[in-house]
Regions:
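Glycine-rich phosphate/pyrophosphate-binding loop regions near the starts of catalytic domains
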Residues: 19-133
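N-terminal amphipathic/basic leader segments beginning at the initiator methionine
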Residues: 1-28
């Protein structure tokens, strides 16, 4: 079995990344890099990962995916703040049945959330999984 037979459209994925790079030029590689700004003495980087959980059910019912990305960034940023750290960067993971307009709305929300939080989107993954509901 190959990617296409499993329902993954590699060309759509590449196109999606290129579109996102226009708004977040640091993404696209296999690892996110972040340069610690000058002025930090003995910096310790704090990272956090969270999810939106059952809120995706609300998006499905409302047929509105425009704010869930903002919520995702907020969950992660808030966790970092509770550690007494300043959020600096964000990495995302989006798993979907198919890369489509809903995923684009989620990503626009993630970019907006990053802007509101003052963090940079430095990378992540958008994965197609045809068996996902």
């Amino acid at each position: 079995m190959n990617y296409k037979d499993s329902g993954v459209d590699l060309e759509a994925g590449r196109s999606f990344v290129e579109t996102l790079k226009e708004k977040a030029p640091s993404i696209g590689g296999f690892g996110g890099m972040f340069e610690v700004p000058r002025g930090y003495e003995e910096p310790v980087l704090v990272s956090g990962t969270d999810g939106v959980g059952t809120k995706m059910n609300i998006c499905r019912v409302a047929r509105d995916y425009t704010t869930i990305g903002i919520d995702l960034v907020a969950m992660c940023v808030n966790d970092i703040i509770t550690c007494g750290a300043k959020p600096l960067y964000f990495l995302d993971y989006v798993s979907t049945r198919k890369i489509d307009d809903k995923v684009a709305d989620i990503m626009v929300g993630i970019l907006k959330g990053c802007e509101l939080a003052g963090v940079k989107l430095i990378g992540g993954e958008t994965a197609e999984n045809f068996r996902q509901r």
